[in-house]
Amino acid sequence: MSKSQINLQDAFLNQVRKDKIPVTVFLVNGFQIKGMVRGFDNFTVIIEVDQKQQLVYKHAISTVAPLRPISMLNLEAKSDDD
């Protein structure tokens, strides 16, 4: 991936992490995890639920839904700065 392309997944996860926006993570098996994104890498996301952390593999995630809207303009501007 070239530097000029926006990595939307990383920008989205980083935005909800930095702004401490609660998310609902829907897994492919139907389970839902409601908590805060604490970190992520290429393969996993760390979600904090009730002061406990869960490591979730990205291939098990179908959807990440923030509890409040995030600005897509902020995501694009931050990605363009890289």
Swiss-Prot record:
Q: Does the keyword RNA-binding apply?
A: yes
What keywords does the record list, in alphabetical order? RNA-binding, Stress response
Can you tell which superkingdom this protein's organism belongs to?
Bacteria
Q: Where is the Sm domain?
A: 10-70
Which InterPro entries does the record match to this protein? Answer: Hfq, LSM_dom_sf, Sm
Gene Ontology BP terms: regulation of DNA-templated transcription; regulation of RNA stability; regulation of translation, ncRNA-mediated
Indicate yes or no for the key word Transcription: no
- Signal sequence span is none
Question: Which SUPFAM superfamilies does the annotation name?
Answer: Sm-like ribonucleoproteins
Q: What Gene Ontology terms describe where this protein resides (cellular component)?
A: cytosol
User: Which Pfam family, an example, fits this chain?
Assistant: Hfq
**What's one GO MF term for it?**
RNA binding
Question: What does the UniProt record say this protein does?
Answer: RNA chaperone that binds small regulatory RNA (sRNAs) and mRNAs to facilitate mRNA translational regulation in response to envelope stress, environmental stress and changes in metabolite concentrations. Also binds with high specificity to tRNAs.
Record NCBIfam families: Hfq, PRK00395.1
Task: Give the family from UniProt.
Answer: Belongs to the Hfq family.
Q: How does it associate, per the subunit comment?
A: Homohexamer.
Name this polypeptide is given: RNA-binding protein Hfq
**What organism is recorded for this protein?**
Syntrophomonas wolfei subsp. wolfei (strain DSM 2245B / Goettingen)
Q: Which gene encodes it?
A: hfq
